[in-house]
C-alpha cells in the first residue's frame, strides 16, 4: 500500500511544436521506437546522458565554450530551449481540480507521476507542502495538495497522507486556509460557498474612472479574479462523490456538518498570512456579505455582471487561442466554459488541449509550470550571452544561433488584440511574450531582451540572415515606448494603472504587491539598454522621445538604489539580480565605476557580499524579507554569475575578486560542460519562488565569456 507506481521514463517524450510544449507517454512499443527519446528529453527527466568528457577548460573562455557545447545539445528543433518553470505548489491543484470537475479524463501516466511529484515534494520534517517547493509548510499548500493526492486515488491511510493530515490539523484544518484554497475547495464541494469571501462580478461594471475598477489591477490578479467572480456568483459546485465526502471528514478538525461556514471566512493560519487583510478589505467583505448580497443585490444586476465577465473571458480565450495568461486563470476559464457551454463544447475541448502545455515532467514526476513556458525569454538571453562571450561568429555555434533567431522571428506578435480597448489589453504589436506568440502577452523586459538578441545578430554579427525588416523592429520600439510610467520607471505587462493603495484590497493573503503594476528596476533597465542599442543602429527614429525616455529611466534607476547601494530584484533572487540589471543600465548611459557614485556604491555592495570561496550566495528569502540573506547551502553559481556580469559591465578596476568568482564558477562545472542544479532562482509577488533552471547555463556562459574577452591572459 505504501509504495507508489512509477512510469517507465524511457517512454516519455516532450513535443515542441514551435514553442508549444507538451509531454507524451508512449505505451506502444512501436510508437516509442519510431519516436526516439532526445538528449533534451533525457536531461529533463534526469536520465543518464552518457556524454563524453570535454577537454579540461584551461581558461574562462574555454569553460564558457564547454558550457555552451553542453547547452547547445539541449536546443529544441524549433530553435528554442525548454525547461520546467515550477516551484509554486498551488498550480497542480488548480489543474487537477479543473480536470476532475469538468469530467476530463486523466491519463494514468499523468496520475502516477503527479502523485510521485507531490510525494517527493512533501516536507521531509513535517510532511506538508508550502506555497512553493522550498517554502515552509502551509495550510494553502497542504490542504490543496492533500486533496489532489486523494482525488488521484491515494489512500487516506498512506503514511504520507497520515503525516500531512496530522500537520494540517495542527494548523487548524482547511478552515484556516487562505482565500484561493477555500475557493477551490468550494468548487469541489469540500467547503460550503459561505466560507469564501465575496468575489463579486459587479466590480467589472464599475466605470473606468473609478479608482478601484478591475482594469487598473495587475494583469495576473485581474485575470484570476475574472473567472473566479463568475464561478463565485453562480455558487457552482461539482457533483458530490465519495472522495469529496471523505475529504469533508479529513480536512477539518471539527465535524463537517457542525461548521458555521460564514464565521470562518476570515480565518487564516499564521503560516499563510503573508499579507494580512486590511481593515478596508474586512469592511468591504462585511458589507458585501451581510448587506449587499442578502438584501440589496438585484438579480438583474448580477446577471448583467456575469454576462459581461463571460464576454471578457471569451476575449481572453480568443486572444490567446485558449492558452490564456497562465496556469491559474487557464483552469478557471475552462471551468467557466464547462458550466456555461457544456463538457463537449469546443471551448472546453480546446481548453483541455491547451492545458497540456502547463505540465512538465522531471525526475521527481509531473508538475505544473507557472506559465506555458519561458521559451522566448531564455532564448533571447542565450543569444545575448553567446554574443557577449564573443562566440556568435564561431562556426560551431552559428547554426544554433540561426535557429534561435528564426524562432524569435516566428514568435514576434504581429498584431494587437481584437477589441483591445474593450478587454483592457495593452498594445502588443511588435512585442514578444515570455513564452510564445500564442500566449500573446507582451512584457516590457521580454520585448527588450528579444529585441536586443535580434539586433546583435542582425546588425552586429556577421553572416546572419536579416529576418526582421526595419518596420518590425520599429513596431517593437513603438510598443516599448508605451511602457514608461510618470516616475520614469517601467512595469511589466503594462504601465501602472492604479494606486498602490489598491493593495488594501489584496484578497490573496499569501502574496505581496500583486494588485497593481509597479516600477521594476530590472524591467526599466532592460528597456533602456534595448533603446540604447536600437538608437546605435537607427539614430534618427523617434530620436527625441527615446532620449527623453532614457534620461527619465536613468533618473528612476538612480532613485531606486537602496541606501546600501543595491537594487531590489522582483523577478529573480534578488539583490544580485536587480543590481546586475541596474549596473548594466547605468553603463549603457555612459556611467562606470570611475565616473559614477551610483555605480561605485552598487559595486561596493556586491563586493561586500562575496564569500571566501569567491562566490555569492543569496536565498529567495531576500525577496520575502527585503534584506540580503545568504543561501543556507553556500555560494550559488547563478548569483555569482549575476555579480560578475554586474561589476564587469561597469569596469570595476580590481580584477582579483572578479577572478575569484570566475574560478568558483569554473570549479562547479562538470566534465561534460554542464552545471548542476542549485538553489531556486526566481521569485514573484515577493513571496513565491519559481525555477529558472536554464539560468545556470546562460549566465555563467555570459560571465565567463565576458571575463575571458576582457582578461584573456588570466586562467
Swiss-Prot record:
InterPro entries: SQ_cyclase_C (IPR032696), SQ_cyclase_N (IPR032697), Squalene_cyclase (IPR018333), Terpene_synthase_CS (IPR002365), Terpenoid_cyclase/PrenylTrfase (IPR008930). Coiled coil: none annotated. Pathway: Steroid metabolism; ergosterol biosynthesis. PFTB repeats lie at residues 111-153, 550-590, 599-640. It holds the Pfam family SQHop_cyclase_C. One of its GO terms (molecular function) is lanosterol synthase activity. In Aspergillus, the biosynthesis pathway of the sterol precursors leading to the prevalent sterol ergosterol differs from yeast. The ring system of lanosterol in S.cerevisiae is firstly demethylised in three enzymatic steps leading to the intermediate zymosterol and secondly a methyl group is added to zymosterol by the sterol 24-C-methyltransferase to form fecosterol. In Aspergillus, lanosterol is firstly transmethylated by the sterol 24-C-methyltransferase leading to the intermediate eburicol and secondly demethylated in three steps to form fecosterol. This is Lanosterol synthase erg7B. It comes from Aspergillus fumigatus (strain ATCC MYA-4609 / CBS 101355 / FGSC A1100 / Af293). The gene is erg7B.
